Each structure stands twice: as C-alpha cells, then as structure tokens.
Amino acid sequence: MTNAPGAGGPTALSAGSAASAEPWRAPVAAGALEAVVELPGSKSLSARALLLAALADAPTTLTGLLRSRDTELMLAALSVLGARFEDLGGSGTHLRVTPAPLPLHVQTGPDGLGRIDVGLAGTVMRFVPALAALADTPVVFDGDEAARRRPMAPLLDALAALGADVTHLGEPGFLPFRVGPGDGALLRAEGTRVAVDGSASSQFVSALLLLGALLPGGLELTPTGPVPSLTHVGMTVATLRERGIAVDEPALRAGDGERTWRVHPGRPRGGEVAIEPDLSNAGPFLAAALVAGGRVSVPHW
C-alpha cells in the first residue's frame, strides 16, 4: 500500500535533505587547553542579587549580572519602587545599585499608581509584589498573556493576611492585581507570623523570606503544604545570610506543614557582590578540560 503525500505515511527524502547532509564535526583540541571563560551569571542568583541590592543599607556594586529579558524586567520593576541603577561597564553586567528608601517611594503615572510589567518572569511576578506591601503608593502588576495563567493566590492571600491591601483586577488569584501598603501596619509590626501554601511554587516562600528581613520584628513563615524546589528556597536563605541577614531554618526531618523559617530583621548589607555563573553553562567548558587535558577557569564560581 502506498501513502499519498500528506496522508501521514513515509515520504522519500529529496537530494540535499537532512539524510544526505554532511554530519557536523565536533572541534578537536590540538593540545591541552588553557583558558579563562567568562560566563553569564545565574538567572536565579541575578534576580535575588538585584532585589537585595535595591533594599540594601548602602550602595552595591554587582559583577557578572545576567542580561536577559527577566533581568530587564526586574530592573524596571525595582526602578518603579525607587531603586537606581548605573551601568559601569557598558555591557550591563557590571552595575552600581543605589537602594530605595523605606517606605519604598513608588514612581507613579498620571493615574497616581505605580505600574509594573512582570512579562513572564517568575521572580518578578512573585518577589516584587511582596515588596509593594512596603510601598507608599499602590502598584498594579500585569504581564504577558501566559503569565495571567500562572497562580498567584497563595502569595496574595499571605500578603493580605499580613495587612497589605490586595485588589484583584481580573480573575481572583491571577494577574492583573494591585498591591498597596494598607494602613502601613507592616512597617510597625514587632513580630509577624504568616502561613503560605507553597505547593504551587517555592517562589511564594522565597518572596516572603525576602520581605521578612525588612519588617521591624522579622517574619516567621510556615508553608502549609509540600514545597517543591526546596533548593531554591535554600538559595534565597544563603543570599540573605551573605548580606548579613540571620535566618533560622526548619529541622531537616520536619514534615510538610511543620517547616518554619524565621527571618530576623535588618536591611541587607551593601558592598561588592560577584554573581556566580550558572553551573549548566559552565559544565561544557569544564568537561572540555577533562577530555582534552589542561585547565579551564570560570571566574566568580
């Protein structure tokens, strides 16, 4: 039986098609390698470094920043909240960050509101709304069409429980929405506890941990369900500690609903920060040295 063209059966490959193309030839090292390879910074670490620098107690110089759409969206969002950024090298990977004052002073439009486009950047859509609870003016958040399908309810519910003013501007629990400071009680609280359903994203937990350091009495945070990607929560805790913020972590064997993080109050420390490259980008270059011999160095890692 012969299949007609377009009927889903096999068709003959024409000359010059993939079947007859020359195979790609991998490069071969002429000898042992000796190289220094500058790689872009980790996307996750770049987002956290920018946010903590924007909230620090003094200016911060960032080296090795990843330049991507997510980074550009984070820079724009933090600028709306009052932080300032100066490109020191012309490439956008070396920045001086002047932190925003508290309460965060929102750069508003003609309607008197701040507006932040989160695009499709998870760290912008989850981390930055938590900061808007400490702003002096409400901020409207929206993003790409696909972003409007990503869940936000656990974070928004937690912020409302902390006293923030949360207004849904579309389907409840999704973008777009508005977050404001409410009556400002968060900046007066001497001790704050909150629970969050972290089962949809560990970013909800990280967002509240980052917020907690700015509260006068810190924050005690208990996720109510299983938290995926606990390694990313660990990354958030590590970056907070590197900037001088004390964080108490739950016991290793604590079960779901029993894990509690305690963030002690304080503004992150400014200064010089080098952002570690992403391991997935570094891997091929390091493997090349193992195969060919010699040495390949990756700075800041």
Regions found by a protein language model. Name each.
Residues 1-301:
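Structural preference for solvent-exposed beta-strand-turn elements
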